[in-house]
Each structure stands twice: as C-alpha cells, then as structure tokens.
C-alpha cells in the first residue's frame, strides 16, 4: 500500500486538475450560449434559402443551371467541418467514422473522393489515415466569418464547375441540444429537390429579371455559402456543448477519485497508527 504522504500528493494533484476542468466547463458553458445565439441568428436565413432552392429544384426552369442537373458520379467532394481544439469527447471521431463509412460506400462503387477541411482536427486526422485533402482552413476561433470559409468553398465549387466533381456534400455536427449532437452528411450539389409534398404536387414556373443565368449563378453560390456557414456555427455550438459535458464528467470523476484516494489514505493512516501502537506495546513488554 502506498504511503500516506504519497497518497496526499495524489489527492492534491487530482484536486488541482479538478479545478482546471471545472474552469473549462464554465468557460465552455459561456461560449456555448454565445454560439447558440449566432446559430439562432443565422438559421432563419439558411432555412429560408433552402426553401427557395427547393422551389427552384422542383420548378420548370427556362434556364437549367448546372448545379440543378444530376450527373454520372465519378468523383465526389466533401466539405468537412471539425474543431480546432480537442477535449470535446467523441464529437470529432464520431463525425469522422460516419464520413469514412460514406467514403467507403462510394469507393466500393469506383468513385473517388476529395476533401476540403475546415478545422485542424480534421486536417490532422486525414493526414494520418490518408485522404485526398485539396483545401483546408484552420484557426478560425470562436466567431468565424464567411470570408474565412470562402477558400475551401471556392476550391470545391470551382472543381464542380469544371466537371472534376459530380457531387458535393457538407459534413458537420448538427446541434440538437446540450446533450445531443448528431453527425450529418448533407448534399449541397446538385441541389436536392424539396421534400415538401405540397411542392412536389405543383408545377413551378419562374420569370427572371434581368437574366436567369446571372441571377442563378449568384443565388446558388450564396445558397452553398449559407449552408456551409450554418454548418460551421452549428458545429461550433456542438463543440462547446460537448466540451462542457466532457469537462463536467471529468470534474465528477475527479471527485469520485478523490473520495477513493481519501479512503485509501485513511486506511494507510490507520495501518500506520496501528503499527506505531504495536511497536510501543512491544517495547513496553520488553522492558
């Protein structure tokens, strides 16, 4: 059994770690609320844009934009949103597992995959396991802007425009609540038709002013950008929620460990006292 002094040192070490995890839990809770505010502010725009695009995809258009046309799939692209920092439980690895399974399904069909990474954890993971990473951006902080994301988005859209990609997906964590974040893979291009049954039963005709090509070029790019930005802010809220939960679990586990160490310390102390008393009694008997 370890000595009382050694056990006291372990207890002090766990207590110091517990203070750190508690502080990180509180910081994550504060950042999560701010991230939720940003997510709530951007969500109406992203959802409205998705509805508008759903109308377009179901419509009888006088100009059929390339982003609306299905192609034979030979190569797919993924915009992968991960975190820049760790200590957020299984948030990243669960996302990567889902992505790897989807990539394998395409690979089994003879389809090649390209990756554009947002977040350093995704970059380091696919550098280690292997993956065709064609673009990346890291270190965006807690308040990302669209201008920081535009690099990977532009690379993937250019590849799609040039016919080097036939499908484009965004991979990110969807924030449900503090305890639940779901890894999702959402198709961006070609634009998926709306799932609304009312829209499916109707035929839509549009008139464009001044020019359908110029309008759709701008509108559809804005759509992709809005979905990527929404994915990033939701992933950020998911990160802070997962970190808060992970740090709370670490703090609670630290408390349990301290109780166990305290019990071991008491037993060690009791054994030490018993040994001292035995030695005293033995010495007195010898006299």
From Swiss-Prot:
One of its GO terms (cellular component) is plasma membrane. It is a peripheral membrane protein. The keyword Cell cycle does not apply. One of its GO terms (molecular function) is ATP binding. Belongs to the ATPase gamma chain family. Produces ATP from ADP in the presence of a proton gradient across the membrane. The gamma chain is believed to be important in regulating ATPase activity and the flow of protons through the CF(0) complex. This is ATP synthase gamma chain. The lineage of its organism: Bacteria, Pseudomonadati, Pseudomonadota, Gammaproteobacteria, Enterobacterales.
